[in-house]
């Protein structure tokens, strides 16, 4: 039994990272993080993890460019290209990254993940290690590996559903013609306020979750003969899980954003001051706080909400 190091995932990860740097959707550190995360996720024998990452990255990058001029007029420091650092890449991938690496380490003995992480698995996970056959069984089978295969797949799905749902809600919801309402008080707030809700943003978060659910379902149907024996059941479970992850994750992100993430507004420019604002507040003009305590940054809120959503769906598995 030898080590298997797939080359195609390396080529794809390199191409996506290079494209991101070239188009300025990724910083150099973001490109490096995207390559590492992308390669290890796409190298998992069950390609649903890697495909979900690609769909999230490409869809999220496209969405950030929608209405870029309008968003630039509403937010200080807005980057129309979505220039993501290595930290931002990790915040938007870490839960799914860990889940995918654990899945490969547990169920693919010849994978690079098994060689890198297999010896570090805790006893209760090592006990369920097995050589998984996509032709014979479905990764969503609750009886495989003590249920860990299904749990890890749904953690990854929940993570990406939350992240894409929140991305679509924040990037498209800000374009709503009616002002959003703060999730905690329902007071009207300026577009771009952390924790602000709008009808278009809520629908966008649902759409993002459904997209990720359909992505995972399609991967399961293409790869696993075991999953094709019960198509309707798996379609319902993945789309429902994606929808819950998109809506629930975005709602959790909004609650955290409205309470423990500070939102400041410049009266002189009539724009929200974001984490990326380079001009100091005293240079921007008179600033007022709209909501939230200055405890977490936007990236930290995204990290917490995506982790919680992924773990919740995994627990419900």
Stretches with model-predicted labels:
Residues 1-317:
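Hydrophobic alpha-helical transmembrane segments
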């Amino acid at each position: 039994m030898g080590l298997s190091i797939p080359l195609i995932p390396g080529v794809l990860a390199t191409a996506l990272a290079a494209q991101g740097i070239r188009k300025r959707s990724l910083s150099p550190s973001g490109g490096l993080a995207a390559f590492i995360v992308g390669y290890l996720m796409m190298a998992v024998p069950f390609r649903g993890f890697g495909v979900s990452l690609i769909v999230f990255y490409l869809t999220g990058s496209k969405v950030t460019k929608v209405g870029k001029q309008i968003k630039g007029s509403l937010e200080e420091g807005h980057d129309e290209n979505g220039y993501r650092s290595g930290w931002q890449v990790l915040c938007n991938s870490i839960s799914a990254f860990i889940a995918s690496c654990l899945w490969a380490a547990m169920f693919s003995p010849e994978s690079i993940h098994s060689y890198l992480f297999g010896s570090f698995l805790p006893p209760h996970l090592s006990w369920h290690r097995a050589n998984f056959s996509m032709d014979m069984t479905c990764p969503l089978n609750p009886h495989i590996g003590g249920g860990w295969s299904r749990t890890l797949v749904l953690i990854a799905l929940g993570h990406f559903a939350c992240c894409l749902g929140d991305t679509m809600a924040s990037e498209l919801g800000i374009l709503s013609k009616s002002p959003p309402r703060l999730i905690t008080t329902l007071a009207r707030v300026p577009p771009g306020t952390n924790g602000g809700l709008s009808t278009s943003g809520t629908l966008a978060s649902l759409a993002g979750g459904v997209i990720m659910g359909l992505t995972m379902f399609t991967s399961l149907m293409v790869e696993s003969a075991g999953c094709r024996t019960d198509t309707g059941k798996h379609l319902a479970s993945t789309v429902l899980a994606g929808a819950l992850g998109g809506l629930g994750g975005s709602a959790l992100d909004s609650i955290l954003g409205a309470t423990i993430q500070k939102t400041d507004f410049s009266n002189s420019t009539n724009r929200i001051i974001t984490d990326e604002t380079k001009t100091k507040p005293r240079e921007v003009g008179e600033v007022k706080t709209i909501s939230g305590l200055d405890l977490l940054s936007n990236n930290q809120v995204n990290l917490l909400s995506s982790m919680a959503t992924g773990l919740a769906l995994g627990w419900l598995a």
